[in-house]
Swiss-Prot record:
Assembly mode: The basal body constitutes a major portion of the flagellar organelle and consists of a number of rings mounted on a central rod. In Gram-negative bacteria, at least four rings, L, P, S and M are present, whereas Gram-positive bacteria lack the L and P rings. The rod consists of about 26 subunits of FlgG in the distal portion, and FlgB, FlgC and FlgF build up the proximal portion of the rod with about 6 subunits each.
Family, similarity comment: Belongs to the flagella basal body rod proteins family.
Pfam families xref list: Flg_bb_rod
Major localization class: other
Signal peptide start-end: none
NCBIfam families, per database record: FlgB
PROSITE patterns: FLAGELLA_BB_ROD
The protein's name: Flagellar basal body rod protein FlgB
PANTHER family named in the record: FLAGELLAR BASAL BODY ROD PROTEIN FLGB, FLAGELLAR PROTEIN
GO cellular component terms, A-Z: bacterial-type flagellum basal body, rod
GO BP annotation list: bacterial-type flagellum-dependent cell motility
Protein location: Bacterial flagellum basal body
Gene: flgB
Classification via InterPro entries: Flag_bb_rod_N (IPR001444), Flagellar_basal_body_rod_CS (IPR019776), FlgB (IPR006300)
């Protein structure tokens, strides 16, 4: 029973973490819309979530690091390395080499893509917690 709850919360935690990371990436793209040569970035949310969940199920935490020197800084257990950032291919080229398409960035940031799904995930987690609390209180 507790394993099911832990797996559910782990999935939701990773989904929220990835959505937050994507929100930061999209915001950085918008902030650099006028920077010459800036390359717009993004992540493949579904692929990253799948990779994270597969790594979590096998008990590994992403890449396995080997310390070959006593001067290496050890990585904390459970630390997740960064998501694979992808370059976004522009629909229209610009003279200064900047690949940020403001219409696309705004639609990904605000219209129901990332932020609405983030809020939906938070709402879902809240409803799960309330349901569990109700079951525990009823005994």
């Amino acid at each position: 029973m507790l394993d099911k709850l832990q797996n559910t919360f782990h999935f939701q935690q990773e989904a929220l973490s990835l959505r937050n990371k994507r929100q930061e990436i999209l915001a950085a793209n918008i902030a650099n819309a006028d920077t010459p040569g800036f390359q717009a970035r993004d992540i493949d949310f579904a692929a990253e979530l799948k990779k994270t969940m597969e790594n979590g199920r096998t008990g590994s935490h992403g890449l396995q690091l080997t310390m070959t020197s006593e001067r290496h800084i050890p990585i904390k257990p459970g630390y997740r390395l960064e998501a694979d950032l992808l370059y976004r291919v522009p629909h229209q080229t610009s003279m200064d080499g900047n690949t940020v398409d403001m219409d696309m960035e705004r639609s990904n940031l605000y219209v129901p893509d990332n932020s609405v799904k983030y809020l939906a995930d938070v709402t879902f987690i809240n409803s799960q917690v309330k349901s569990m609390m109700a079951v525990l209180q009823q005994g």
